[in-house]
Curated annotation (Swiss-Prot):
Subcellular location: Secreted, Extracellular space
GO molecular function list: acyl-L-homoserine-lactone lactonohydrolase activity; aryldialkylphosphatase activity; arylesterase activity; metal ion binding
Organism: Oryctolagus cuniculus (Rabbit)
Sites carrying sugar chains: N50, N269
Cofactor annotation remark: Binds 2 calcium ions per subunit.
Name by which UniProt lists this protein: Serum paraoxonase/lactonase 3
Family: Belongs to the paraoxonase family.
GO cellular component terms, A-Z: extracellular space
Sequence positions bearing Phosphoserine: S165
Amino acid sequence: MAKLLLLTLLGASLAFVGERLLAFRNSFGAVQELEPVEPQNCVLIEGLENGSEDIDILPSGLAFISSGLKYPGMPNFAPDEPGKIFLIDMNEKNPRAQELEISNGFEKESFNPHGISTFIDKDHTVYLYVVNHPHMKSTVEIFKFEEQQRSLVHLKTIKHELLKSVNNIVVLGPEQFYATRDHYFTNYVLALLEMFLDLHWTSVLFYSPKEVKVVAKGFSSANGITVSLDKKYVYVADATAKNVHVMEKHDNWDLTELKVIHLDTLVDNLSVDPATGDILAGCHPNGMKLLNYNPEDPPGSEVLRIQNVLSEKPRVSTVYTNDGSVLQGSTVASVYQGKILIGTIFHKTLYCVL
């Protein structure tokens, strides 16, 4: 009887592991084939060779870019170099990347920028908020942008016990922002186990100097986050669940889920087209190739546009797809006046005229 029970438990365990392995491979797009969709007028931006994980474009057309992210399990072509923030003027005929100088007093050697978000104050001062992972911790850095000097002045470092494994942020007021937590565990092995078991323990946080709280939870891997043009709705990407959550924002900053838009790809960062209100999503169509990077068979890139977000049937269309021959590991796409920038975790940056 004991042997029979043991064999039954062993069989059930093996069946569970097999099911999770198959689900894990499928969730990371291990079998997805890519059909190329590429605008004709595209060029790679010179000087951006080590990633452009997140991009935020001001109404003036100045684009901030975080570069050089060192993320557990992901490739990095310049592991000994600190991260950087670049600026691109989308109004230029041939846009070029310019590294922004950071003021003294900030620990540049451990700068590891991830998600970014801009905020323009009433006096038109531009502030850049950056998710930073110094020594693989999570902080949010606040910089003031000096446009004439093309530099960043570091103002403040935000730390909090809830701000762990932070991926992205969207700023809605002075020191008021939503942040996504992409893993419950900060240990890399436990984080992998968390993904393997699909625990849905990640969340969205709200931060202000007076209050820090969880405002939405139950995500497989909360990733990109942005806000609608009228600031009434918050859009959250759940990467490994392959969907986008549409959340209503309340006066107390709590979020209520209205709908979920299902996509057949791993969703990373989100942005909103300022002309239409459409969501643009940087995606990973074959995420398993990110975890097992092979330069001979690189991960591809994909950008989706979601129109009529609040309708019963949002329309999803493909803006860009590449098998990795041009662009590897896309994370974000941001548009300005018919032009688009597509960023990556560790690779290059693509500029296209749509």
